[in-house]
């Protein structure tokens, strides 16, 4: 397609798409300077680069640390994802926040909590939280990992009032 239409046309179409995407909801930015308003739109694009199409909100798309034998940050921490989902809700990006909550519904443990972090596909990721402490089995969780997802979901619901979206999540996530 690039050979047919030319790279300039493809770049223009791509820029037009993402410009429209970031501005699809009417948000009053009149109190802000033009430069700050542009930063608002650009920040949505930056957020989008960290969101997997399957709904996972990734901490960072890095991989260079793995060449030194370390772990990376291309994981979803549900706490961090919840805060980003709330920011997306405030920006009117309901589809991305919906996808995140669907992703969370697939990851939540049967007893209703989230573990430390997950891969973009929803599998349990490596963790530094112990499963045993002083010879006793413990859950390797942090309470805000679960509570912030529910808080962000509530903010999403009160903003968009999308009952049909929330209904299938009720039993699994809420």
Name each model-derived stretch.
Residues 1-73, 94, 98, 105-111, ...:
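Acidic/polar, glycine-enriched structural segments that form the non-catalytic walls/loops
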Residues 56-66, 76, 92-174:
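Helix-terminus loop motifs that line ligand-binding clefts
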Residues 79-80:
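Hydrophobic alpha-helical transmembrane segments
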């Amino acid at each position: 397609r690039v050979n047919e239409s030319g790279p300039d046309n493809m770049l223009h179409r791509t820029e037009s798409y993402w410009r429209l995407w970031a501005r699809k909801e009417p948000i009053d930015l009149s109190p802000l300077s033009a430069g700050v308003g542009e930063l608002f739109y650009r920040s949505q694009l930056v957020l989008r680069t960290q969101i997997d199409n399957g709904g996972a909100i990734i901490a960072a798309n890095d991989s260079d640390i793995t060449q030194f034998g370390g772990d990376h940050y291309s994981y979803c921490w549900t706490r961090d994802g919840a805060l980003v989902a709330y920011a997306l809700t405030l920006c009117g990006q309901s589809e991305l926040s919906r996808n995140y909550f669907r992703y969370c519904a697939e990851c939540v443990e049967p007893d209703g909590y989230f573990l430390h972090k997950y891969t973009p596909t929803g599998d349990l990721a490596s963790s530094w939280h112990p499963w045993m402490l002083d010879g006793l089995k413990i859950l390797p969780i942090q309470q805000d990992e679960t509570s912030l997802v529910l808080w962000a979901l509530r903010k999403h619901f009160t903003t968009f009032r999308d009952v049909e979206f929330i209904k299938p999540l009720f039993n699994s996530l809420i």
